[in-house]
Amino acid sequence: MFSIEPGNREGPPGSLTEPPRDIVVIGASRGGVEALKGIVAALPPSLQSALFIVLHISPTHVSLLPDVLSRAGPLPAEHGRDGTRVERGRIYVAPPDHHMTVGPIGFIRLDQGPKENHTRPAADPLFRSAASVYGSRVIGIILTGGGSDGTQGLIAIEQAGGLAIVQDPGDARDPSMPMSALLHDNPDLCLPLSEIPGVIIRLSSVSQAST
């Protein structure tokens, strides 16, 4: 696997080529496990992107989400560990009771800072850090869940030139998080869950070995 260096990777001046969208950050809560399984199951093993996932979970619960996602699709999933270099083709899951962010030199950072939106881990810290470090290369996705977590982070992603995607509230088990984003932001896309993997694949840098 190859690490993903920070910064924008724009095409040359005047180029019609967009930068690869190789950093995918996802926030979810109630109903999120099934939604996440549906996304990762549809991704190819050659996907040259890193996925970061925040699923709201009680600090006292044991998170089995990496195992669940590794079984659901071809990409290996693991809990994010402080100091781990970001690599392509991997899924990083925020561990219970820790915010997961991306540091300025492309390493994962974990902390137990104040809860945001009444939760830790929260999507907003992850989204903000990804926008700051990777800019227009980021795809931010808000899935089913209660509350408003992810809304402010999605705004930061758009302001940095990244792409904002929201699950269609009518398609979500709990529409609160998607509705919050739609009410307070202007996401680029509002899609049913089944269409989100295709967008990730089209906009991410995919290995030529798969073509």
Region annotations inferred by a language model:
Residues 1-211:
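Strand-loop microenvironment adjacent to phosphate/nucleotide-handling motifs in alpha/beta enzyme folds
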